[in-house]
Amino acid sequence: MLNLCHALRGVRQFSCSVIVKVKCASCSIKLQDQDPSKPGYYTKPKSLPDSKLNPDLQDLKYLLFSQDIQLSKQAIQNDPDLKTKRDLLLRVICKRCSNALHHNNYNPEEFPESTLNDILNYVPRGSNVMHIVPFVEFPLHLDPNVLKRNDLETTLVLTKSDQVFKDKNAVSKKVPIFMKQFLKNTLRIDSNKTFAISALKNWNISMFYNYFKNYTYLLGNPNVGKSTLINTLLQKYLGYKVKIDSTGKINSPSEEVMQEAFTNPKNFFKIQAAGVSHIPNLTRSVQAYQVGGKILFDLPGYSTSTSRLRLEELIDERWLQRLRKTDLFNRKHIKQKTYESMKGTSQGGCYTVGGIFYLVPPKGSINQIVKYIPGPSKTFKNIEKGIDVFNSCNSSSGTHPLSRYCGIKSVICEKSQYKRYAIPPFIGSIEIVLKDIGYILLRTTGRYEFKGLHEIWIPRGIQVGIREPLENLIESGYQRYIETNGKESSCPRDRPIISSLYEMAPDEADTLNAVKKSYLEKTEKDLSARRFVDDDPYDLVQHLEKKKNPYWYYQW
């Protein structure tokens, strides 16, 4: 409350009477009502309701053409004319966001991707930057180009840690030690500035707030948790949106608006909150927030993908919402690790979640799979059978008996729309990570015997990688680090712990030799990363207990 009282003293008047000064409450772009073809267009309410009519909530929604407004009836009845006018102006959103969020009318062309350089145009040289990376999909989303920049003061922030670890202890103590050594060993970056947090679970939020400096920018890909983090900070420290003009002057909301933090804190937060959505690239402009005594900037997400294909074109909308909405993640999988069993077959038996990928174990292998991706799983005789079933599901308009297992659209109901990847040799367990989708844990059981490489077929345009199981890796590394008083590294130095996969031709029979060939090509300019290049591949895989993770190599 002290922070809020301080904010109320000397607060600068913020006029809501001229709508052109207001930004879209969802994407932060400047609103305009002149040209429907240009960004920021909104439909102006025809008129404000007459206070004598005591309108209900549905009337207000109609005036905003179903835009995002959640006023309580009690607040309206107290002073309908005043509160309705102010809240309409503060919560109005542009036509693009309204269509996408409330009418399921999503046009990818209206949500253009931005590059890193596009976004850095918003960030002055020498600024404090928080590079936001979802830990659940590590190492995907981690951008060395951001961490290595000399013109920025960059801190790595690993979000969604509750989707990897059982409790806060590992996140607070063990992750920073591991990441310091990982960055040094893998990327030659010497940095102590790493935080692992969970905005939903409030893990390390106080520590994060105490650390970040005034005028800090949040930088990362779309849907990595920037807005969720901001909203957690706003609630915890009574934060609010501010405007900063070209001279650096901070324009805060009016005293009347700020007073609502006392009288109606729930509605106050709804007005001030950052727009959180499962839709990527929703944020189109920089939005500044006053969080306690500090200014924090939410930047639009940037893309590093070379593919023009979007998940919205491939995956069913309902499935995609489950994949992207962090609050829907079921943490019981982290604690219980319930697995499904699958045996590799001579017909190419496969495991899938919604048709988003097809995992094909080698013949005779016995596998356990722990799924951290929402949606029911299904096994098929082979990939062709799975694709045929899901094609029928799309043609049946939901009446097919297996429709609940189908999470893809008809555009990828052909085998040619998938890429075949070979997973480099491993022993024990690995985690397969799909960018913007999630991960699964794959474990081979029984006495080790090489039976062939595992394969995974993925729609073109989706990025994939593997890692050693992250929680166990960090826990065991920390134990080793403590027992040796820091002499032993928390992050293994004797082997790579992450790797890209190797694309194979659909008819490639000798995948092991093909993997070695691709490995040599990928490491041609990184000779120091090469391992076991003189070993025969088939001899090498007989001794994985001693020669771990051969042909593992991650391309940043």
From Swiss-Prot:
Keyword hit for Mitochondrion: yes
- Domain of life, per UniProt, equals Eukaryota
Where does it sit, as one GO cellular component term?
Answer: mitochondrion
A GO MF label: GTP binding
Q: Where in the cell is it found?
A: Mitochondrion
Transit peptide, residue positions per record: 1-21
Coarse class of the protein's main subcellular location: mitochondrion
For this UniProt record, the keywords arranged alphabetically read as follows:
Mitochondrion, Transit peptide
Location of the CP-type G domain: 113-305
Keyword Phosphoprotein assigned: no
Family the entry assigns = Belongs to the TRAFAC class YlqF/YawG GTPase family. GEP3 subfamily.
Query: Briefly, what is this protein's role?
Result: Interacts genetically with prohibitins and thus may be involved in the mitochondrial lipid metabolism.
Kindly provide the name given to this protein in its UniProt entry: Genetic interactor of prohibitins 3, mitochondrial
Q: Which organism is it from?
A: Saccharomyces cerevisiae (strain Lalvin EC1118 / Prise de mousse) (Baker's yeast)
High-level lineage? Eukaryota, Fungi, Dikarya, Ascomycota, Saccharomycotina
